[in-house]
């Protein structure tokens, strides 16, 4: 029995051993090293191609010769991926060398961009067009579309001048083209309808195109001189319904804040200022001590009014967007709703906005397509009111009010300076409320006729906008001796109705190697704008703030009505031979009711050509084609117009309210008088643009870029013409000015991959612009009061050059004659240079006529951006840097001058001022004294001008997308979380505590709202 058991165990052991051997043999036959070579179609080896065994983490990359080797089983699928090429899968079927040929991803070559009245392949563009996609905007969860564009595209200047809730940004394309009231705003079209760039939620945008030259923009004629921005909203797609929800939550704080001295130091340096002026000190030592120890805060306070005001609000903001997309074989749709709420850094300040978007595309019959677009918003802005009547003004005067003035005292009263007390006004029932609503709707029918390539398009659109604004300033209690009143109420209401109709025909035909595209159309636009305003004061209490509650005897009112129309005919011809030689001609004929008969019609043509050098046989056969796969040279010229000059400026203007005596005996009769001489000859401003560009891509699309040179010349700029005062009245505008902008744009992008999972993209852009005034009215070479000189940029700073400060009395005695007599000069004062005289050489005295010069310009010479993005497995990181440079700024008033008009003193002024014990010629601040606007030291000079260039870390975002294997378990297709920072910090040499991008007042009534940094987080869900 025992032997039998031993025999059975031996048999089992041998069986197991045999099975192991067989298994090993089978494994050895199926598991082996797979060797391969990866090349492109020309046979060139591709380096760094990712090779991954599907369903595993087993992978490798190709070496310098395009070769790879890895272990795999027979039947395994290898996933091959490479930037610029179509990913593919290859089955392991033998141990022979795998030869894999990668197919170039033609998506880049087939990429289309939105242009005027259509789309165009990017590689076939002959104009200067930049594009921003939904993905570019997604990494910047900002409240404003305009703010999201900063640094994204060459030729685009974006300035965020305020952090006020709901505030957008100023957008310019290729410099400042005019100094007239026609303005520099680009034409913005949202799904083909005229609008504002912030009318649409950034989450609802599919793409934005910037038409920068005449070739791309002339199809819009006399509205396109400042460039055109085309916004396309998101559309639905065929397939199952998808629901997407995104949100963000964030907090704001100022990017910069001035460092004001506390009350005891304020008193100390105020005494110094008094001594420097030969006056008695204002504060005794025991008073300064009371300010320091805080023992009597009502009478000896220490209040930083600016900091208090900017910390009175929560600064919390949140936004949400929910969209539903879907469709079938004939119909697709997109429905989106959005909500955002931004609480200000100051209390009672907020912006609440609700948006809705609906788009639909449906084939209602064979060859007949219907497109519907509806976009709407409701916007509500709230802010405190006071003296002056805006939150910006309140902040400006909080800059002025020193720490020696109390906030709210223990008895409930308020400290104040004149009529200014942010604490009192914020506690009052005063308010500003602005409510605006807008709905934009369009319908388009497209008939693709039985004739191949021929289509007809009809489109109607309507935009209705309304607003209701209310500003109430209550009777406001300061203390027993001061109440500001009476209460006042201003109400404004307005509405605008804009309608448009378009009819277009397009035809596309290819004859052998010749491709033709034709477009012809006409459009009619009408605008009707109505306004009404009313005012009353003296109300029974602070809670009845309706016009009917005010004193009827104080009532005033006004109304307005403006209408204009535009009739246009336009066309475009595109020709291409083998997609190698490209030609485009645009023509638009506009008639505008804004001008007088005989001057209403204008022709706006453009022509452009392109040469795709990379399509030439000699290029394809050259070795360089293996590196440079796309190379195109293009050039364009055309003329654009700017009709945005107001309504009917050619008409004679009469002013009512002037009585005249009539009859015998003479009695006064109601009448009017002619206020201005009209000019029926005026017409639109014209901008001629020359553009030469180069587009290229290398390394199979991994590295691409564009280079552009442009020259813009704007003529017939509208400006008033000076006439003799003997005429007794004003003269209307005339086409008398000219401005030029010459520049270079560079845009580069590199997309790379390291290993299997690490992807990155680097995209810098740079724009340099030389702006110059070319012509002024009456043949003048300068208009100093308007800061304009022929040959200089718009917005010059005109003033005195300085030679530091007077060090001592000996230097004062030896100095040339300054702006004041020597008896009024002191050591530590600004020393102005004598640079010229009547004969063009220094004449021994400084005066305004001969010794002022151009100190700089507020117009930037260059702007740039750097976009960085990376992803590793589920993690992603993006960063955006934005900068402007080559310009200067001058701020004054309470922001720059210590003790100005009873204002404060900042730490840098106190610590860096000229002192008798340390008489520094180059001290950052002059001799400390109390100041007002007419002081000698405060003349516009290079002493006060600062370099306003800056480099800002505009946005950083870090996100994580959860694996689909996880999210599908909870019924979600995609889940992403992120943290983000906006306006994180900047590098600049501007005034300490002040942001160079901020719009800051310079006069005795300054106003500003600090630009804000935003720290946020959010979630994206896709169902």
Model-derived features: where do they sit?
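Short, small/polar-rich motifs associated with maturation and membrane association
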Residues: 1-357, 362-365, 369-371, 375, ...
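Small-side-chain secondary-structure face that scaffolds active or pore-lining regions
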Residues: 344-353, 375-388, 436-438, 446-540, ...
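Conserved small-residue
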Residues: 244-298, 649, 734, 751-858, ...
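Outer-membrane beta-barrel transmembrane strands
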Residues: 313-331, 338-340, 423-471, 490-510, ...
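Outer-membrane beta-barrel proteins
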Residues: 178, 193-236, 256-262, 303-321, ...
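Surface-exposed loop/turn segments flanking beta-strands in extracellular/periplasmic regions
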Residues: 266-301, 390-425, 470-488, 530-557, ...
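Flexible loop and strand-edge segments within Gram-negative outer membrane beta-barrel domains
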Residues: 254-256, 297-338, 342-349, 355-423, ...
């Amino acid at each position: 029995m025992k032997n039998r058991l031993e025999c059975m165990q031996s048999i089992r052991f041998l069986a197991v051993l045999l099975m192991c051997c067989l298994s090993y043999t089978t494994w050895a036959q199926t598991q082996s090293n797979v060797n391969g070579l990866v090349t492109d179609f020309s046979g060139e080896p591709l380096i760094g191609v990712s090779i991954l065994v599907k369903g595993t983490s087993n992978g490798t990359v190709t070496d310098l010769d395009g070769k790879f080797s890895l272990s795999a089983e027979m039947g395994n699928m290898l996933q091959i991926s490479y930037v610029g090429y179509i990913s593919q899968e290859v089955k392991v079927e033998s141990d022979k060398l795998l030869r894999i040929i990668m197919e170039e991803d033609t998506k880049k070559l087939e990429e289309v961009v939105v242009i005027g009245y259509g789309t165009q392949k990017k590689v076939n563009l002959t104009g200067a067009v930049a594009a921003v996609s939904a993905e570019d905007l997604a990494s910047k969860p900002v409240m404003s579309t305009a703010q999201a564009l900063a640094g994204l595209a060459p030729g685009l200047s974006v300035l965020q001048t305020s952090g006020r809730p709901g505030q957008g940004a100023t957008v310019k394309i290729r410099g400042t083209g005019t100094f007239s009231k026609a303005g520099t705003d680009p034409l913005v079209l949202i799904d083909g309808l005229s609008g504002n760039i912030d009318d649409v939620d950034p989450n609802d945008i599919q793409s934005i195109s910037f038409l920068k030259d005449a070739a791309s923009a002339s199809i819009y004629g006399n509205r396109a001189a400042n460039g055109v921005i085309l916004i396309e909203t998101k559309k639905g797609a065929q397939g199952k319904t998808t629901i997407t929800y995104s949100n963000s939550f964030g907090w704001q704080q100022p990017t910069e804040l001035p460092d004001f001295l506390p009350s005891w130091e304020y008193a100390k340096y105020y005494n110094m200022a008094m001594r420097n002026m030969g006056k008695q000190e204002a504060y005794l030592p025991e008073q300064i001590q009371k300010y320091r120890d805080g023992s009597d805060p009502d009478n000896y306070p220490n209040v930083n009014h600016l900091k208090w005001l900017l910390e009175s609000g929560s600064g919390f903001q949140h936004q949400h967007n929910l969209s539903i997309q879907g469709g079938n074989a004939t119909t697709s749709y997109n429905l989106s709703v959005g909500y955002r709420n931004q609480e200000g850094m100051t209390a009672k300040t907020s912006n609440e906005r609700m948006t809705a978007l609906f788009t639909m595309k449906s084939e209602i019959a064979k060859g007949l397509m219907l497109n519907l677009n509806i976009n709407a918003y409701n916007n509500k802005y709230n802010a405190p009111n006071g003296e002056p009547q805006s939150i910006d003004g309140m902040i400006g005067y909080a800059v002025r009010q020193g720490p020696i003035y109390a906030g709210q005292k223990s008895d409930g009263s308020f400290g104040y300076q004149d009529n200014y007390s942010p604490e009192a006004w914020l506690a009052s029932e005063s308010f500003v409320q602005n409510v605006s609503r807008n709905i934009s709707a369009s319908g388009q029918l497209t008939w693709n006729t039985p004739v191949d390539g021929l289509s007809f398009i009809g489109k109607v659109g309507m935009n209705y906008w309304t607003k209701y604004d209310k500003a109430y300033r209550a009777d406001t209690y300061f203390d027993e001796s001061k109440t500001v009143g009476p209460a006042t109420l201003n109400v404004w209401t307005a509405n605008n109705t804009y309608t448009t109709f378009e009819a277009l025909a397009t035809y596309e035909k290819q004859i052998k190697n010749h491709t033709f595209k034709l477009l012809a159309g006409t459009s009619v636009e009408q605008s009707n704008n109505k306004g009404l305003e009313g005012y009353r004061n003296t109300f029974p209490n602070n809670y009845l703030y309706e016009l009917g509650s005010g004193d009827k005897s104080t009532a005033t009112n006004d109304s307005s009505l403006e209408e204009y129309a535009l009739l246009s005919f336009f066309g475009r011809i595109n020709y291409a031979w083998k997609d190698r030689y490209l030609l485009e001609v645009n023509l638009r004929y506009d008639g505008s009711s804004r001008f007088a008969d005989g001057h209403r019609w204008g022709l706006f043509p453009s022509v452009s050509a392109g040469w795709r050098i990379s399509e030439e046989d000699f290029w394809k056969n050259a070795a360089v084609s293996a590196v440079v796969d796309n190379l195109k040279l293009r050039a364009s010229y055309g003329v654009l117009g700017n009709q945005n000059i107001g309504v009917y400026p050619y008409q004679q203007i009469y002013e009512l309210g002037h009585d005249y005596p009539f009859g015998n005996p003479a009695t006064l009769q109601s009448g009017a008088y002619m206020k201005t001489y009209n000019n029926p000859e005026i017409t639109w401003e014209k901008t001629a643009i020359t553009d030469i560009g180069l587009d290229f891509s290398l390394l199979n699309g991994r590295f691409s870029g564009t280079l552009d040179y442009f020259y813009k010349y704007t003529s017939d700029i509208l400006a008033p013409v000076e006439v003799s005062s003997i005429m007794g009245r004003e003269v209307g505008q005339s086409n008398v000015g000219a401005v030029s902008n010459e520049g270079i744009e560079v845009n580069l992008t590199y997309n790379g991959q390291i290993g299997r999972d690490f992807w990155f993209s680097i995209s810098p852009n740079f724009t340099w612009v030389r702006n110059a005034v070319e012509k002024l009215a009456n043949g003048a070479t300068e208009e100093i009061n308007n800061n304009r000189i022929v040959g200089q940029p718009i917005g010059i700073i005109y003033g005195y050059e300085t030679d530091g400060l007077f060090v001592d009395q000996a230097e004062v005695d030896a100095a040339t004659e300054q702006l004041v007599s020597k008896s009024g000069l002191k050591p530590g004062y600004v020393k102005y240079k004598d640079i010229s005289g009547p004969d063009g050489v220094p004449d021994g005295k400084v005066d305004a006529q001969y010794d002022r010069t151009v100190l700089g310009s507020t117009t930037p010479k260059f702007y740039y951006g750097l976009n960085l993005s990376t992803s590793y497995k589920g993690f992603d990181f993006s960063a955006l840097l934005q900068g402007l440079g080559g310009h200067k700024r001058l701020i004054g008033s309470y922001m720059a001058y210590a003790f100005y008009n009873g204002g404060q003193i900042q730490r840098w002024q106190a610590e860096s001022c000229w002192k008798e014990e340390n008489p520094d010629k180059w001290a950052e601040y002059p001799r400390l004294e109390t100041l007002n606007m007419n002081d000698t030291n405060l003349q516009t000079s290079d002493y006060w001008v600062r370099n306003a260039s800056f480099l800002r870390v505009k946005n950083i975002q870090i996100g994580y997308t959860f694996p689909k294997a996880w999210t599908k378990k909870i019924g979600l297709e995609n889940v992403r979380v992120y943290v983000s920072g906006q306006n994180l910090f900047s590098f600049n040499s501007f005034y300490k505590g002040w942001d160079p991008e901020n719009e800051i007042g310079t006069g005795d009534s300054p106003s500003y709202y600090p630009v804000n940094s935003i720290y946020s987080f959010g979630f994206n869900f896709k169902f």
